[in-house]
């Protein structure tokens, strides 16, 4: 298969046992009108035909992979949105905007549905969900397998609102880290959605296993429970209802965490990162003065950090002759990567190969104040806390780290904020209500600003004392790393209602 076509068209074909399970969720009779909007290699069609379904329609834009009397070899995106199907089933293509072909991008830019509900941050499969619902009859059923991140990402708010306004979910199967497709790392779900019907409760099948799914007996693999139907376009929580109640109680003590500002220093250095890293050699004093200490995700732990990597950073205007004269070791090391550095995208500006591209917020990071670093992404399947690290002055973040600064009008100490973010309550809140993709939590600006934050009531002496005790305990822990201090910190946090009891 053409690899570029596979990526731009999202061609990851569904295993037969998954197809059989999904068809088993259908309740319409064998004469029902059924649509498969992205047939791929025809595995859904073949299974439906074998089971006696005859009124079938399918779309597949790639005529090279299937030719079939039931298949229309054109784009489903341009199909007519008339409510005409009893059931729609399939595996829509998952493609990020940057991986779409120019023809696909133009098709979406010209599409009124895409313009109404989506944007260039959205995934291609969003429009397949929306158009499928538009083409269902009232009472019709949509059964799809797709990534689960539309439950939580900011860019899917329009899709979530559309789904709430046009029907209800009947069943959702959460695969989490279970392997469903070969070569696909995204966490996926199967859902059954009924158009125009208000279903009070959703049946959730939650599979908590990393083992590959090899059988159509899927429901025996996970925990089954019911949750109330989704009622807003906010993050959809699929955990059992008692967990949602506990999270709501925790939130009642808090406000959203707009008490910090999130910044980054570098744009992505990708594989050129090594070109700017300094090695274990005797650099000159001038070279050391033109370097910075950078913390990576691997250096971070809860509360503290374990080290840093030195990076070359020449800010003054120089030419290559000056580089050779004043920074001979830098010149030698950069020369090993020169060809690659010269090929970097420069936005049509002059970019010497020895300079970091698009350095941002440098003056902010150079302030003489502590800040909090956290990995941009964190796998949580075997963890019970995050790695919010209180970092010293003049330590800079690299591209796999998100940095948080306390705003000037915030009275709470940076130590208190660090303790709060490392609490079990915040961990559970992010686990169930944050942006989570396959047990990987994302710490970008929007997810961070959504975290509830427990402010101190400075009029209450008891709260002020707890705040000061937590501040001093964090400083003590950073000094001697005594594990018992963490228990004392948590006890004080719980006195402020910073806990989730599940």
Curated annotation (Swiss-Prot):
Catalytic activity, per the record?
a 2'-deoxyadenosine in DNA + S-adenosyl-L-methionine = an N(6)-methyl-2'-deoxyadenosine in DNA + S-adenosyl-L-homocysteine + H(+)
Which biological process, per GO, is one annotated for this protein? DNA restriction-modification system
Q: What class of enzyme is it?
A: transferase
Alphabetical keyword list: DNA-binding, Methyltransferase, Restriction system, S-adenosyl-L-methionine, Transferase
A Gene Ontology molecular function term for this protein is:
N-methyltransferase activity
Task: List the InterPro entries.
Answer: DNA_methylase_A-5, DNA_methylase_N6_adenine_CS, MethylTrfase_TaqI-like_dom, N4_N6_ade-DNA_methylase, SAM-dependent_MTases_sf
> Matching PROSITE patterns, A to Z?
N6_MTASE
Tell me its EC number(s), please: 2.1.1.72
Q: Which domain of life is it from?
A: Bacteria
Pfam families found in the cross-reference section? Eco57I, N6_Mtase
What family classification does the UniProt entry report for this protein?
Answer: Belongs to the N(4)/N(6)-methyltransferase family.
The protein, known as: Type II methyltransferase M.HincII
- Species the sequence originates in: Haemophilus influenzae
Q: What is the lineage of its organism?
A: Bacteria, Pseudomonadati, Pseudomonadota, Gammaproteobacteria, Pasteurellales
């Amino acid at each position: 298969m053409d690899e570029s076509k596979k990526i731009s068209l999202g061609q990851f074909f569904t295993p037969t046992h998954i197809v059989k399970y999904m068809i088993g969720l259908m309740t319409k009779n064998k004469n029902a009108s059924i649509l498969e909007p992205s047939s791929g290699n025809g595995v859904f069609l073949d299974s439906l035909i074998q089971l006696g379904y005859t009124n079938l329609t399918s779309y597949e834009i790639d005529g090279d992979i299937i030719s079939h009397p039931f298949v229309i070899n054109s784009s489903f995106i341009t199909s007519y949105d008339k409510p005409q199907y009893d059931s729609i089933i399939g595996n829509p293509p998952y493609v990020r905007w940057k991986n779409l072909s120019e023809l696909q991008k133009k098709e979406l830019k010209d599409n009124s549905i895409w313009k109404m509900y989506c944007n260039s941050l959205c995934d291609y499969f969003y429009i397949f969900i929306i158009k499928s619902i538009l083409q269902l009859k009232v009472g019709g059923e949509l059964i799809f397998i797709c990534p689960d991140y539309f439950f939580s990402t900011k860019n899917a708010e329009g899709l979530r609102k559309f789904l709430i306004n046009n029907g209800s979910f009947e069943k959702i199967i959460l695969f989490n880290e279970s392997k469903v497709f070969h070569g696909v790392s995204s966490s996926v779900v199967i859902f059954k959605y009924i158009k125009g019907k208000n279903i009070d409760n959703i049946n959730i099948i939650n599979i908590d296993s990393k083992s590959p799914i090899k059988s159509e007996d899927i429901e025996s693999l996970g925990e089954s429970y019911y949750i109330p139907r989704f009622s807003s376009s906010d993050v959809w929580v699929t955990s059992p209802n008692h967990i949602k109640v506990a999270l709501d109680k925790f939130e009642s003590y808090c406000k959203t965490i707009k008490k910090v500002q999130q910044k980054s220093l570098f744009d992505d250095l990708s594989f050129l990162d090594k070109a700017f890293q300094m090695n274990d050699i005797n650099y000159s004093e001038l070279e050391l003065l033109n370097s910075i200490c950078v913390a990576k995700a691997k250096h971070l732990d809860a509360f503290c950090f374990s080290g840093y990597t030195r990076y070359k950073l020449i800010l003054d205007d120089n030419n290559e002759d000056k580089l050779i004269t004043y920074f001979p070791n830098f010149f030698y090391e950069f020369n090993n990567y020169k060809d690659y550095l010269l090929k970097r995208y420069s936005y049509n500006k002059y970019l010497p190969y020895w300079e970091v591209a698009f350095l941002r917020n440098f003056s902010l990071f150079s302030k003489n104040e502590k800040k909090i670093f956290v990995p941009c992404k964190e796998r949580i399947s075997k963890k019970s806390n995050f790695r919010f690290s209180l970092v010293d002055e003049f330590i800079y973040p690299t591209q796999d780290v998100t940095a948080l600064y306390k705003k000037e009008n915030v009275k709470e100490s940076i130590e208190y904020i660090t303790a709060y973010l490392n609490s079990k309550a915040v961990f559970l809140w992010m686990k169930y209500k944050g942006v989570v993709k396959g047990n990987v939590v994302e710490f970008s600006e929007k997810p961070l600003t959504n975290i509830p934050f427990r402010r101190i009531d400075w009029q209450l002496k008891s709260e002020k004392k707890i705040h000061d005790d937590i501040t001093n305990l964090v400083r003590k822990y950073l000094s001697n790393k005594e594990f018992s201090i963490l228990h004392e910190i948590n006890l004080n946090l719980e006195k402020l209602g910073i806990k989730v009891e599940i």
